Amino acid sequence: MEEFQRYFELDRYQQHDFLYPLIFQEYIYALAHDHGLNRSILLENAGYDKKSSLLIVKRLITRMYQQNHLIISANDSNQNPFLGHNKNLYSQMISEGFAVIVEIPFSLRLRSSLEGKEIVKSHNLQSIHSIFPFLEDKFLHLNYVLDILIPYPIHLEILVQTLRHWVKDASSLHLLRFFIHEYRNWNSLITPKRPSAHFSKRNQRLFLFLYNSHVCEYESIFIFLLTQSSHLRSTSSGVLLERIYFYGKLEHSVEVCAKDFKAILWLFKDPFIHYLRYQGKSILTSKGTSLLMNKWKYYLLNCWQCHFYVWSQPRRIYINQLSNHSLDFLGYLSSVRLNPSMVRSQMLENSFLIDNAIKKFDTIVPIIPMIGSLAKAKFCNVLGHPISKPVWADLSDSDIIDRFGRICRNLSHYHSGSSKKKTLYRIKYILRLSCARTLARKHKSTVRAFLKRVGSELLEEFFTEEEQVLSLTFPRAFSTSTSRGLYRRRIWYLDIICINDLANHE
């Protein structure tokens, strides 16, 4: 937010809640471009990064000033003199710039609500890896889990109505209406299995923001119920929500909902209950019984349908027992398994054999969905056999190796918390051989002949930085047995703020 303060005259705009003039400011597009630069490990936005420049931004702003009204329809570009031949580029730039603008009032309220309060502000919580040590600590003592697919609103106008409480600028709301009606693939954000490449690549930040702001409306009430029903009430229960404005909203919900929910709070008495969410999937875990989890399930369904105008079905919420269920979350399969052990006890002349089972939290990389992601990205076929990447064959050798190496390092970095590394080694093997096949295709040679001619040192980029850093951190593990010592360790990093593209199997 300090970055915004240096550029924006926020006091003047905030007095009237008037954000629309910011869309004519050049630095808005610079901030949006910096935010999206190299955000995809597959470099799908490289074309946009090369085309974007200050000159294009100036030309775009000039055209907006010259028009009596702003029309940016991708469907009738032949009749639209504003966009001309750059309709996709201009539309994407305005969409990403508008996403920066509409986040301003939420960021301001979040900052003001944090002032003077004893809420954890550690930067460690910004990493999505920070959730796994929490799960490791808590899941061993829980019984049931609700796998929840969050429903989507029945009408796009509901998204605008949600923001009307925070953005009073009618012009900004009209522009928002235009964007959400131009790209009608709203359902694809929550159900990514539907085809939505046009939607996800061009407007991801704006629609993720709209989705989070909408979900937060009923999450605020839900979090209130959780804190009221738990004996261990947390003063910072909103810290794991995707930070937009939620602290003030939660406090307001306590005042409004205290009277309304007293009658039902006794139904949800549970001292050990935890809730977490990422994008369109949320998880509710509890130490309670299956009856209690069924109460939560049907309460959520009724709350969504009766109070928030979203349609959901019971089959979108699954009740599972943690002891025999693997949790698919953030690209990992997490489970609680029993690790049996036998202890021999000697007392005087008698000896006893004691069977002891210890619960252990396991996190592994799911191999089948991972191969599916690699096959979709054209690194291998559906059976996991590496293939060449023809679209990269026109690049230089160094660029090809750099792209494959970056993907490999990012995957190793993201999946460093895996309990078993065999899956990760197989993925790295697929990427290395795919890189070799791509280079051989470019030079019109076979893989064997190409590697024999240039040497295996050409693929040294695939040795990850983590291996070098960890060799310094755990020198004994490297000196004794690297494969047995170091690579069995799970390591969670504090610089991962979003799920890896290839790890997002949904």
Curated annotation (Swiss-Prot):
GO terms for cellular component: chloroplast. It comes from the Eukaryota. Belongs to the intron maturase 2 family. MatK subfamily. InterPro entries: Domain_X (IPR024937), Maturase_MatK (IPR002866), Maturase_MatK_N (IPR024942). Usually encoded in the trnK tRNA gene intron. Probably assists in splicing its own and other chloroplast group II introns. Keywords: Chloroplast, mRNA processing, Plastid, RNA-binding, tRNA processing. It is found in: Plastid, Chloroplast. The gene is matK. It comes from Mentzelia lindleyi. GO terms for biological process: mRNA processing; RNA splicing; tRNA processing. Its main location: plastid. The keyword Nucleotide-binding does not apply. This is Maturase K. GO terms for molecular function: RNA binding.
